[in-house]
C-alpha cells in the first residue's frame, strides 16, 4: 500500500481525509487537520496534565485528588467537553485510537508532528508554534490515557469506570481547573468514584487498549506495565457482565445487551500481543455470544462495537469461527453502504440537525479502511475519501467539522461544546429561565442560558 493510502486511512479515525473535489488541499493540510483533532485529546486531560487548553489560566491542573479506596486514580480523559470521566465511552475511544495508531503506523509516526503548543486557542495556534519533545503526539496522548487505565485496573475485583457526577458537573460552565476547586455539589473535589460496577464492557475495552499499547509502545518498561494492567483489566472483565449505568448520561440500556464485545476484543488483542492460544480459544468461545443481529442495525459507536468485532474477528481468525457469520465487509455494507446517500454514510433517519453525528461517516470510513488494510486492498478508497472529506468541508454548506480547520474556504465550528475553549474561570450558573430551546442552543455552543453567579 502506498503512503497516500496510509495517510487517508489513518486520518479516517479522526474524521479527516481528502477527495478530488478538495484537491487544492495539500498533504500538509491533511496533517494539520489531523494534528488539530489530536489536540482535542490533549484538551480532555484530567489530572496533572499538562492540558494545553488550561495553559495560561489560573488553574492549569484539575482533579488531582481523585482516589478510590485510598489509591490514586487521577488522570485520563474527560467526557467530551465536560469534566466527568465516563469509562463506557472512554474505553471505546481509547481502544479505537490505539488500534488506529497500531494499524496505520506510517501516518501515525511520519505525519503527526510533535509539538507542545505555546498558546491556547486552537483557531489561532499554528502547528509549528510549539517545541518538539521527541515523542509523537498521538503516542503521547495514548500513553496519558493508558497510564490512567493502569491506575483504574486495581485488581480482579476493583476497576474504576466512572469519576464524578454528571448532574453536579453541569452546574457551572467553567474550566476543569476552576471546577475542581468547587464543592462536590458543583462538580468539584472530592468526587464520587465508581470502582466496582458490574461492567465487563468498559474493563474489556480498556484491556484491549492496554494490550495494543503493550505491543506498540517503543519503551520496554511501558510494554511490561501495560501488559500487566491489560491482564488485570481482563480478569475483571471476565468476572463481570453488562455496562455501568450512568442515569441520563450513559444508560446501560443503550447497549441493548451488546457488552461482550469488550472482553472479546480484549481476548483478541491479548492473543495478538502475547501469542498465547488460551486468549484465542476464549475469543472463539465468546464469539457466538456477540449480538450481531442487533449490531448490524445501527452504526459503529460506543454502545455498538459489533461492527469492529466483525472486522477484527475476520482479521485474527482469518475466517470467522464455525463459519457462521458473513464476511466483515458484508456487515459494514449493511450498516453503511446500503444506507448511504450520494455515498455519504448516515443514520437511517437521514440528514439534518441531530440526525448527522460525525461518528457515522468517520466511523464507517475507519472500519472500511481497517478491513481494506487487513485484506491488502484499496477497494473502498473512494468511499473512505468521500466520507471523510465531507467532514473537512467538501459538502453543500462548506461546513467543516474540525475546530480551527478552514482550508479551501471551509466554515470551521465557531462555538464548540468545550468549556476549556472559552477559558472561563468565573462562577457561572444555569439560569432558571433557561428554556428548552435555549438549552438546545447551549448544547450547540450558544451559552445564552448561563449567567454570572
Curated annotation (Swiss-Prot):
Signal peptide positions (record): 1-26
Biological process per Gene Ontology, one example term: cellulose catabolic process
Catalytic site positions: 82 (nucleophile), 417
First-listed, main subcellular location of the protein, grouped into a coarse class: periplasm
Enzyme class: hydrolase
Keyword Signal: yes
Reactions this protein catalyses: Endohydrolysis of (1->4)-beta-D-glucosidic linkages in cellulose, lichenin and cereal beta-D-glucans
EC number of the protein: 3.2.1.4
Keyword annotations of the record: Carbohydrate metabolism, Cellulose degradation, Glycosidase, Hydrolase, Periplasm, Polysaccharide degradation, Signal
Subcellular location: Periplasm
Comment on pH dependence: Optimum pH is 5.0.
InterPro entries, alphabetized: 6-hairpin_glycosidase_sf (IPR008928), 6hp_glycosidase-like_sf (IPR012341), Glyco_hydro_9 (IPR001701), Glyco_hydro_9_His_AS (IPR018221)
Quaternary structure and partners: Monomer.
Name recorded for this polypeptide: Endoglucanase A
Gene that encodes the chain: endA
Amino acid at each position: 500500500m502506498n503512503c497516500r493510502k496510509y495517510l487517508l486511512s489513518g486520518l479516517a479515525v479522526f474524521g479527516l481525509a481528502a477527495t478530488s473535489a478538495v484537491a487544492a488541499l495539500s498533504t500538509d493540510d491533511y496533517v494539520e487537520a489531523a494534528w488539530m483533532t489530536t489536540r482535542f485529546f490533549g484538551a480532555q486531560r484530567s489530572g496533572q496534565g499538562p492540558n494545553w487548553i488550561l495553559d495560561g489560566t489560573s488553574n492549569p491542573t484539575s482533579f488531582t485528588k481523585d482516589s478510590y479506596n485510598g489509591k490514586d486514580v487521577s488522570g485520563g480523559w474527560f467526557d467530551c467537553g465536560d469534566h466527568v470521566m465516563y469509562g463506557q465511552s472512554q474505553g471505546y475511544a481509547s481502544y479505537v485510537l490505539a488500534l488506529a495508531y497500531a494499524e496505520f503506523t506510517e501516518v501515525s509516526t511520519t505525519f503527526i508532528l510533535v509539538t507542545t503548543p505555546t498558546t491556547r486557542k486552537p483557531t489561532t495556534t499554528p502547528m509549528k508554534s510549539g517545541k518538539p519533545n521527541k515523542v509523537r503526539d498521538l503516542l503521547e496522548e495514548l500513553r496519558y490515557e493508558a497510564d490512567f487505565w493502569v491506575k483504574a485496573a486495581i485488581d480482579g475485583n476493583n476497576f474504576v469506570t466512572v469519576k464524578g457526577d454528571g448532574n453536579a458537573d453541569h452546574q457551572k460552565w467553567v474550566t476543569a481547573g476552576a471546577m475542581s476547586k468547587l464543592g462536590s455539589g458543583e462538580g468539584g473535589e472530592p468526587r464520587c468514584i465508581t470502582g466496582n460496577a458490574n461492567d465487563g464492557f468498559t474493563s474489556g475495552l480498556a484491556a484491549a487498549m492496554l494490550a495494543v499499547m503493550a505491543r506498540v509502545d517503543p519503551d520496554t518498561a511501558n510494554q511490561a506495565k501495560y501488559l500487566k494492567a491489560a491482564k488485570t483489566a481482563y480478569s475483571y472483565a471476565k468476572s463481570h457482565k453488562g455496562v455501568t449505568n450512568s442515569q441520563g448520561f450513559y444508560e446501560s440500556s443503550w447497549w441493548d445487551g451488546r457488552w461482550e464485545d469488550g472482553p472479546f476484543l480484549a481476548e483478541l488483542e491479548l492473543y495478538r500481543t502475547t501469542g498465547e492460544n488460551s486468549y484465542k480459544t476464549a475469543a472463539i468461545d465468546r464469539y457466538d455470544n456477540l449480538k450481531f443481529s442487533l449490531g448490524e442495525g445501527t452504526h459503529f459507536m460506543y454502545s455498538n462495537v459489533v461492527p469492529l468485532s466483525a472486522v477484527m474477528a475476520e482479521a485474527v481468525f482469518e475466517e470467522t469461527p464455525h463459519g457462521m457469520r458473513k464476511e466483515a465487509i458484508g456487515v459494514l455494507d449493511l450498516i453503511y453502504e446500503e444506507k448511504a446517500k450520494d455515498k455519504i454514510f448516515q443514520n437511517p433517519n437521514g440528514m439534518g440537525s441531530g440526525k448527522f453525528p460525525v461518528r457515522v461517516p468517520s466511523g464507517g470510513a475507519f472500519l472500511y479502511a481497517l478491513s481494506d488494510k487487513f485484506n491488502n486492498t484499496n477497494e473502498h478508497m473512494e468511499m473512505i475519501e468521500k466520507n471523510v472529506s465531507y467532514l473537512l468541508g467538501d459538502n453543500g454548506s462548506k461546513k467543516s467539522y474540525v475546530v480551527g480547520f478552514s482550508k479551501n474556504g471551509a466554515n470551521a465550528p465557531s462555538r464548540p461544546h468545550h468549556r476549556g475553549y472559552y477559558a472561563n474561570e468565573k462562577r457561572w450558573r444555569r439560569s432558571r429561565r433557561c428554556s428548552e430551546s435555549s438549552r438546545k442552543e447551549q448544547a450547540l455552543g450558544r451559552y445564552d442560558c448561563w449567567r454570572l453567579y
